[in-house]
Amino acid sequence: RNCDWSSDVCSSDLVSFATDGAKGAVIELNSETDFVSRNESFQKVVGDIAGLSLQAGGDLDTLLGMDYPGTGRNVGDEVTHQVATIGENMNLRRTAMLEVSDGVVAGYMHNAVTPSMGKIAVLVALESTGDKAKLEGLGKQIAMHVAATNPASTSIDDLDPALLEREKNVLTEQARESGKPENIIEKMIVGRIQKYYEEVVLTEQVFVIDGENRVKDVVASLGKELGADVTLKGFIRFELGDGIEKEEGDFAAEVAAAVSGA
C-alpha cells in the first residue's frame, strides 16, 4: 500500500490536464497502487474527467456533479463505481482552470505516463491576438520552466503580501546584524528583495530554457516578433502531494535535459 489517506499523498496518484484553445483545466485523482495508475481503464477515466473539467470552471463540486458520458452516472458516482470495479480506493482530490479571452492555454506534463497524465501538470496562459502556434510553442516552454522552478506567483503585483512581508522582515533583520549605517541597510534590503523576486516570481525568473533572459523579456520578445502584445496572464501547477513536505529532485536539470532532447 503506497497511499497515506490521512495526508492525501499517494505515490500512484495521477494529475491530468486538458486544453481547448484559450482554456485549460487540470485535475488530480488519487489511487492506492501503481498498478491502478498504470491501468488503461483507469487512465481512460482520468482522461475523461480531465476533459469534462474544461466545463467545470475549476470547481470540484461542479465537476463531481457533471454527467459522465455513456453511464447514466455523474463523475462522483463514476469514481465510486471504479472503486467497486477495481477494488481499490480512489479520490478526485482537486481541479483548477485557466482561461484567456484571446490567445492560448498551453500545457506540459512532467514525469508523464501519457502525454497528458503524469506527476506534475502545468498550464500557462498567454493572451495575444498573435500567431497561435507560436504562442503555443512559447507557452509550453514556459510551462516546462514552471514545472522546474515552482514559482510563487506570476508577477510581482500578485505575490502574496504576507509572503513578501515575512521575507522583508527576515532580510531587514539580517541586514541590521551587519552593523552598517541605516541608509546602507535600506539599499541592501532593496537589492535583496529584488533578488527574492528573481527567485520566486515567474516573470522575474531567468528562463531555464535559455539560462540567460528573464521570462518577461522572452514574452516581450515574442510580442515584437508577432507584432502583437503578448501578456503572461497566469499559470497553474499541480504536483502530486502539493503542500506535503517530501524529497525534491533537481527538476531544473531534468527539464533542461528534456528540452535538449526534444
Protein language model features and the residues they cover:
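N-terminal assembly/interaction segments in proteins that build large macromolecular machines
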Residues: 1, 6-262
